[in-house]
Amino acid sequence: MIKTNILALLLLATFTATAQKGDPVKTTFQSSREWRPTIDNRADAVMIYGTGGNPSDKSRKIPFEERVKSWRDRGYITHFMTGIAWGEYQDYFTGKWDGKMHLDEGQVDVKGDTIWHGHMVPYIVPTENYLKYIKEMHVKRVIDAGIDAIFMEEPEFWARAGYSESFKKEWKKYYGFDWRPQHESPENTYLSNKLKYALYLNALNEVFTYAKAYGKTKGMDVKCYVPTHSLINYSQWMIVSPEASLASLPCVDGYIAQVWTGTSREPNYFNGVAKERVFETAFLEYGAMESMTAPTGRKMFFLTDPIEDWPRDWADYKKNYQATFTAQLLYPNIADYEVMPWPERIYEGLYKTSAKSDQKEKIPRHYSTQMQVMINSLNNMPKTTSKVSGSTGISILLANSLMFQRFPTHAGYDDPQLANFYGLALPFLKRGVPVKTVHLENLAVKNALAETKVLLMSYSNMKPLSPEAHQYLADWVKNGGVLIYCATDLDPFQSVQEWWNTNGNQYQRPSDHLFEKMGLRDGMAKEGQYNYGKGTFYVLRSDPKEFVVKPSNSQKLLDLTKSLYEAKGKSGKLQFKNYFTLTRGIYDLIAVLDESVSNQPYQVKGNLIDLFDPRLPIVTSKNIQPNEQCLFVNIDRVANKQKPQVLASASRIYDEKSTGHQYSFTAKSPINTTNISRILLPGKPKSLIVDKKEVFAEANWDTKTKTYLLEFENSPEGVYVDIKW
């Protein structure tokens, strides 16, 4: 039954776009705790985690309904988040729910060991009975509590899993033949991972369909979201998840792109060197999430995290937070954000004071101030039509099956650190080309390739799950597109049991079917350039990993792409540089690349406020070095400089009032943090009162920009500011 449902969902060619009319939530965060003054970051909404909290919580657990009330009483919109693959579900595993033990439903590796998320918290094989439990004991309860937005996070099946009795039963139901050990052949690996992917697609469909139906009985329009890592990260971490196929589910209203330092610091190869490239990886991860959902019109939140799961030092957190934060803002079509996960961990946790020290401390005041300036900028960050600087129109094709070939490994196939993907992306990204990704599963959607001039693709590391995609690719080339196919097609996954070699099809490779659609009928296409209709395709018989695992070995790909881009793409010259810039309203973003065409810094000039400096200085000129990023407020672009306004602040501004020569507001932010604000005024203040005390200081007034720098201790109760000039 699952197989029939999954196939029907995968073959849907149209998507249900969910209008977010009147949606009041632009910023959100997740917390398993009740409201506390130390974590009151003033986003629009809070996703209260788990009816039983977070399994890793060590403190006393407050009942779910009490946690909800505590946040509502402070003015927050309350949503719900829990894990679909793991969670505080001991009542299910130990038999308290239905009288039967279910620990045997955990994901199991080849050694027979259960894969645990925490104590008594296994990663789950999502059986029908487990889904019944999730619906009855969790989804129903939160809807009864009046919550109309449900976030089911991280539908994850480990690639190394696949040996439990529960999984073997699901295999038999899905494929109709007995389970096969995935480590014994590439085909078994592919089939095993394909099933894992289908199981969680089905799980989310079941749970969300129930949530919407039950909500209707209560007169509620329940929205359902999936917080998920990117396809790139799951592939690198050897985890299988539904990813792009979630777009085929009408019951999914949106997503959270779970990208942060922890995912983006996974090393990759470039120019023969494997190392962390946090900014570049984050840029590609956010891009994969945007392209996965853009054709659907559904809501997408981008996540950043000021720290990460792995314990490191505060300086490391700050540097990489700035890199990921800048990367997310370089997507001007996305303007909704999860500003942080687990504020209780960020504000109250203890982390190293330096990389060489074992001494730990809570978040330094300078970093909490900077972080709050950054997250409060997200409350005002506009969606814009502006473009990231650089030559546009180069895209890389992705498919969900990228996750299927990662593990177990087999003779004849090696893809170190996902090099077959990064081999197509990094040679361009490192030269300042803002490459995009396109998802094979979305090709049926109108305009999926509208912004693509040259499409790079490879079946070395992934395979097409349906033949229909090839018709869309062929039609796109026929109408003038340029396709570069880059693969030897010699990997052992070419011959796995799939549509291209079953049901009467006898293609040795899936690419044979694609090239046949474009007029080649001689089996394995030879390297070279071919014309089809108004377009061109080029077959390059190299696996993309060769361009990055070896030093100075990407020139052939670069030259070929440049030649076709300029001759056939109708896009002018392919520009190489060592930076990206973007303008979003009054905000300026700059990222300068290392390992690029130049080591020159990028110079900015103007009247700027540096948001990555907790002192919010006025900057008139700055050189940004390679491997550095910056975010500025450009005062020169403020539309109405006679209007008093807070341009940057480490608190959220409420109740603004401006009459004549007076401006007042209330600032709110967590206790035990320091606020700094730069305020634009028509004239120099004569009086500046903070909570009934005169605090004006001549030294804090900048005559040229007509801005005042104000500092005080934050309070979640609100600090009242009254200015006269």
Regions found by a protein language model. Give the residues of each.
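Aromatic-lined carbohydrate-recognition surfaces of secreted/lumenal glycan-active proteins
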Residues: 21-31, 79-83, 151-155, 190-239, ...
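Catalytic domains of carbohydrate-active enzymes, especially glycoside hydrolases
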Residues: 24-66, 70, 74, 140-149, ...
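Hydrophobic targeting/anchoring helices
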Residues: 36-44, 49-50, 153, 215, ...
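The substrate-binding groove and active-site-proximal loops of carbohydrate-active enzymes
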Residues: 47-59, 115-135, 185-203, 228-230, ...
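Glycine-rich, aromatic-flanked loop segments that form ligand/cofactor-binding clefts
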Residues: 63-117, 148-159, 211, 215-226
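Active-site-adjacent "subsite" loops/lids of carbohydrate-active enzymes
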Residues: 80, 84-145, 179-197, 205-206
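Aromatic- and acidic-residue-enriched segments that line the glycan-binding/catalytic groove
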Residues: 87-116, 153-184, 239, 413-414, ...
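A conserved amphipathic helix/loop scaffold
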Residues: 463-660, 668, 677-679
